[in-house]
Amino acid sequence: MARVTVEDCLEHVDNRFELVMLSTKRARQLATGGKEPKLAWENDKPTVMALREIAAGLMDYAVIAEAEIVEDEPLFAAFEDESNEAV
């Protein structure tokens, strides 16, 4: 297993706070099984895999935000009905 350092990850994000927030969101996606890893899973925990993806430059806020928008779309489909009639 390759060791992931904070310095490797900071080359792709602005600061440590962003790194924590980004890696948390990505690890949660991986842990819940909703998203597939972008690297080969080498018996790593979701947090390590998230950091490996960030260090490789495969994950940033744009990718996370895009995934969240796609997940939210079905929730708002019910509100697109244009009828305002009382039930």
UniProtKB/Swiss-Prot annotation:
Coiled coil stretches, renumbered: none
EC number, as in UniProt: 2.7.7.6
InterPro entries: DNA-dir_RNA_pol_omega, Pol_omega/Rpo6/RPB6, RPB6/omega-like_sf
Keyword terms of this UniProt record: DNA-directed RNA polymerase, Nucleotidyltransferase, Transcription, Transferase
GO MF entries: DNA binding; DNA-directed RNA polymerase activity
First-tier enzyme category under EC: transferase
Reactions listed under catalytic activity: RNA(n) + a ribonucleoside 5'-triphosphate = RNA(n+1) + diphosphate
GO cellular component: DNA-directed RNA polymerase complex
Highest taxon of the lineage: Bacteria
Disulfide bonds: none
GO biological process: DNA-templated transcription
Pfam family, one: RNA_pol_Rpb6
Subunit and partners: The RNAP catalytic core consists of 2 alpha, 1 beta, 1 beta' and 1 omega subunit. When a sigma factor is associated with the core the holoenzyme is formed, which can initiate transcription.
Function: Promotes RNA polymerase assembly. Latches the N- and C-terminal regions of the beta' subunit thereby facilitating its interaction with the beta and alpha subunits.
Entry similarity comment: Belongs to the RNA polymerase subunit omega family.
HAMAP family to which the protein is assigned, alphabetical: RNApol_bact_RpoZ
Official protein name in the record: DNA-directed RNA polymerase subunit omega
Organism of origin: Pseudomonas syringae pv. tomato (strain ATCC BAA-871 / DC3000)
Lineage, opening ranks: Bacteria, Pseudomonadati, Pseudomonadota, Gammaproteobacteria, Pseudomonadales
